[in-house]
Structure formats: structure tokens, C-alpha cells
Regions:
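Acetyl-CoA-dependent GNAT
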Residues: 3-74, 78-91, 139-143, 149-167
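Conserved beta-strand edge residues that scaffold enzyme active sites
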Residues: 23, 27, 102, 125-126
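Residue-level recognition of the GNAT/N-acetyltransferase active site
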Residues: 68, 72, 101-103, 128
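Short glycine/proline-centered loop/turn elements that form peptide/ligand docking sites
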Residues: 81, 104-107, 124-129
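Conserved catalytic-core motifs of GNAT/GCN5-like acyltransferases
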Residues: 97-99, 117-134, 146-147
Length: 167
């Protein structure tokens, strides 16, 4: 993901998040540090989703996963998360974490397929409505079973949903 993708990513965020990151903040996240990794998914030559990972010590923090409403349900989120997981393995990370709205059952289900498990709650985390965030972790990133689980989730998704042209 690079400078050329920023406007498409910003447009997706504005469609799916109540309080999206600003273009400037997003640019800083994408281009700012060697400890931040962002990927995009494309279908039909257009950006339809993106995801970000921040590395802190030996852990990865999934900072965002967003899919255009017109592409939701096609397995794009699964493919994006899988790419972040692969990156975490290649960086020799040992764990990954994320926050998800407590009410976002589709996302929670996806994260569970990858081995993320609830470990706590951040009360009132989302400022738009005071909703709690569920904190989820996966601690076996360095174990070969982790990437096997990721690839199995991707294979199932491709078989049932298709997915984007590429991530």
C-alpha cells in the first residue's frame, strides 16, 4: 500500500467507520514508520479494502480492517487479515492483538477463526456511542499451527466467497 492508495482507502473508511481516520493521519500510518504495515485488496482494478498492522516489540496490533460496503461478504476481510498474519509470521512476532466493537459479531467470528480469543474489555472505547471494545489476542503466532489455521481459513473463504483479485 502506498501514497496512490490513500484516497481510495480514505473513501472506504468514510463509508464504514463513524469516525474515520483523517487523510493526514492515515498517510502517517502508511508511510511513517518501519513498524507499520498496510495492505489493500483490489477487485476489478479498484481498492475494495485495507488493513493495518503496528509492530510493538514482538507483538502485532491490528489497527484497522475495512472493506467497502459493496464488497462486504465476499471474503475480503479474511484475505486482508490473513496477509497481516503472514506478515506477523515473517517478522517473527509471537502474538497479535486487536480491538473490535462488542456488537460486531461478523468480525468477532472472523477473528475467532484465526485463533483470536477474547481477553478483556475496554469500556466505552468507541467515542461515537460509548460502546465497549472487546480485546482479542492470539498467542501462538510463532507456532506452525498458526499459519496452518490462517491458510485453512483462507481456503474455506475462497471456496465459499471468492475474495478479491489480490491483496
Amino acid at each position: 500500500m502506498g501514497e496512490a492508495d490513500i484516497h481510495a482507502v480514505t473513501a472506504i473508511d468514510e463509508m464504514v467507520f463513524v469516525r474515520p481516520w483523517s487523510t493526514g493521519f492515515l498517510r502517517d500510518q502508511i508511510l511513517g514508520a518501519d513498524t507499520r504495515f498496510h495492505v489493500v485488496a483490489e477487485a476489478g482494478g479498484e481498492v475494495v479494502g485495507h488493513a493495518g498492522l503496528a509492530v510493538v516489540a514482538d507483538e502485532g496490533h491490528v489497527t484497522t480492517v475495512a472493506v467497502s460496503p459493496t464488497a462486504q461478504g465476499a471474503g475480503i476481510g479474511c484475505l486482508l487479515l490473513a496477509e497481516l498474519c503472514r506478515r506477523s509470521v515473517s517478522l517473527d512476532l509471537v502474538a497479535m492483538t486487536l480491538e473490535v466493537r462488542a456488537s460486531n459479531m461478523p468480525a468477532r467470528g472472523l477473528y475467532a477463526r484465526f485463533g483470536f480469543a477474547p481477553s478483556g474489555v475496554r469500556p466505552g472505547y468507541y467515542s461515537d456511542n460509548g460502546e465497549d471494545a472487546l480485546v482479542m489476542w492470539v498467542h501462538d503466532v510463532a507456532d506452525p499451527s498458526f499459519i496452518e489455521r490462517v491458510e485453512a481459513a483462507c481456503a474455506t473463504t475462497r471456496a465459499t466467497c471468492g475474495g478479491g483479485d489480490h491483496v
